[in-house]
């Protein structure tokens, strides 16, 4: 997640727009991976006095072909997504609570990061 790529203005409402470049066509579940990012952009717009429209756009690009060795043709796939700034606010609240604790929470068997940390921990500390 970085800075907002673009912002559409519809009347007095603001719609975040984020560009994504991939090496392959968008899979059905891919847009959902960016839900938190779009919710956070919406919250930041709201907190800065801009009325969010309640939705945002992801625009995915992937290469179709390379012409003449120097020109690449891309396919564009826009996806409209509903946004909820209150879900972003809740993420921030939970982060503050977690960061204020003196120790890390116990590992969760379903957490990919916990699994990774368990595997690399011995390597890193060696």
Task: Describe every region a protein language model picked out.
Residues 2-26, 41:
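Conserved catalytic cores of phosphodiester-cleaving nucleases, focusing on short active-site segments
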């Amino acid at each position: 997640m970085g800075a907002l790529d673009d912002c559409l203005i519809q009347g007095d409402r603001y719609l975040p727009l984020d560009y994504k470049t991939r090496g392959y066509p968008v899979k059905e579940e891919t847009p959902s991976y960016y839900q938190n990012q779009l919710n956070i952009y919406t919250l930041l717009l709201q907190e800065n006095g801009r009325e969010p429209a309640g939705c945002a756009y992801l625009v995915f690009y992937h290469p179709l072909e390379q012409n003449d060795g120097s020109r690449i043709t891309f396919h564009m796939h826009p996806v409209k997504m509903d946004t909820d700034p209150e879900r972003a606010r809740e993420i921030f609240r939970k982060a503050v609570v977690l960061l204020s604790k003196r120790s890390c929470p116990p590992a969760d068997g379903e957490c990919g990061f916990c699994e990774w940390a368990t595997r690399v921990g011995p390597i890193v500390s060696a």
